[in-house]
């Protein structure tokens, strides 16, 4: 069974549990125990009652699964509304339609995560890099949020990647190193490899744009060790921005020709906005 086997419609945890139970062919009686009754499982699946943490662990154990296996099958966009909307927001940012993003803002945000999220919407809606009208207070808020993280989650990594333009280059680099060196990296890569790798590629791009070349090379070396043959998109982006970094430093004609070829490839792949940014960076060199 894999993630494609699980319906991607909006799920409550109970409905998701029911899908997994039925696909594995387990009945309530198969899962029930002295500490977990069939009626409790039924009410949980119907959304009538929530499980305690202990009951949820027993219910997962009853499926002969570990918690990691159970949640690994869960469609990633079901983990949180912020995770889901961040993906939608990325789409708007890519097609350069910032006016469509206003409706994504949370009205009267009170939670810390909601305030951070609104800052990300504001950043993504900017028409140009560095033209987002982010206040010093908002920059401080993002920095304090990221600094307070003790264990990185995939949502935190998405927030970090989305907020690079808010951070000083040195801050962004150090947060990236913290992710790459964290104790949970192997678990994060096991469940969310694509998100982690894309965030690090984004960091490398950001450091090259900011002419922080030695640090960009450090991140590239880390990525070279992480990326495998299936990460073609990430490998291409890493190559393009490595070429850009070399050209910005050496003004080599051969590197310029390679970059021009890369720009044509990006345009052919409908990444014209990124191609334009690279072209503009070359002109400013």
Show where each model-derived region lies.
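Short, charged recognition helix plus adjacent turn
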Residues: 72-99, 264
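DNA major-groove recognition helix of helix-turn-helix/homeodomain DNA-binding modules
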Residues: 54-69
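Mid-protein regulatory/catalytic core that forms ligand/cofactor-binding pockets
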Residues: 109-209
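Amphipathic alpha-helical segments of tetratricopeptide repeats
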Residues: 105-106, 143-147, 180-187, 220-228, ...
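Helix-turn-helix repeat elements of alpha-solenoid scaffolds
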Residues: 91-104, 130-140, 169-181, 210-221, ...
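A short, Lys/Arg-rich alpha-helix, primarily the initiator
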Residues: 1-23
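Short alpha-helical DNA-recognition segment
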Residues: 24-42
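"A position-specific structural signal for the A-helix of alpha-solenoid helical repeats
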Residues: 16, 83, 87, 117-128, ...
């Amino acid at each position: 069974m894999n993630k494609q086997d699980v319906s991607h419609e909006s799920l409550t945890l109970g409905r998701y549990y029911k899908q997994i139970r039925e696909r594995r062919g387990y009945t309530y009686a198969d899962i029930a125990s002295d500490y977990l009754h069939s009626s409790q499982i039924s009410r949980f699946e119907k959304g009538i009652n929530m499980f305690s943490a202990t009951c949820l662990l027993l219910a997962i154990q009853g499926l002969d699964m570990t918690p990691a296996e159970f949640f690994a099958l869960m469609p990633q966009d079901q983990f949180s509304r912020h995770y889901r909307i961040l993906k939608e927001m990325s789409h708007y940012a890519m097609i350069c339609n910032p006016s469509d993003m206003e409706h994504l803002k949370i009205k009267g945000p009170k939670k810390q995560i909601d305030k951070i999220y609104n800052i990300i919407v504001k950043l993504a809606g900017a028409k140009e890099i560095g033209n987002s009208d982010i206040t010093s207070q908002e920059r401080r808020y993002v920095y304090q949020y990221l600094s307070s993280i003790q264990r990185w989650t995939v949502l935190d990594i998405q927030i970090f990647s989305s907020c690079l333009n808010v951070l000083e280059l040195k801050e962004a680099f150090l947060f990236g190193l913290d992710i790459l060196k964290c104790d949970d990296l192997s678990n994060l890569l096991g469940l969310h490899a694509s998100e982690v790798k894309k965030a690090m590629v984004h960091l490398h791009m950001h450091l090259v744009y900011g002419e922080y070349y030695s640090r960009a090379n450090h991140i590239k070396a880390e990525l070279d060790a992480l990326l495998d043959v299936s990460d073609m998109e990430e490998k291409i982006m890493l190559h393009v921005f490595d070429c850009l970094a070399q050209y910005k430093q050496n003004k080599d004609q051969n590197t310029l020709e390679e970059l021009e070829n890369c720009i044509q490839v990006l345009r052919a792949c409908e990444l014209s906005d990124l191609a334009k940014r690279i072209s503009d960076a070359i002109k400013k060199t």
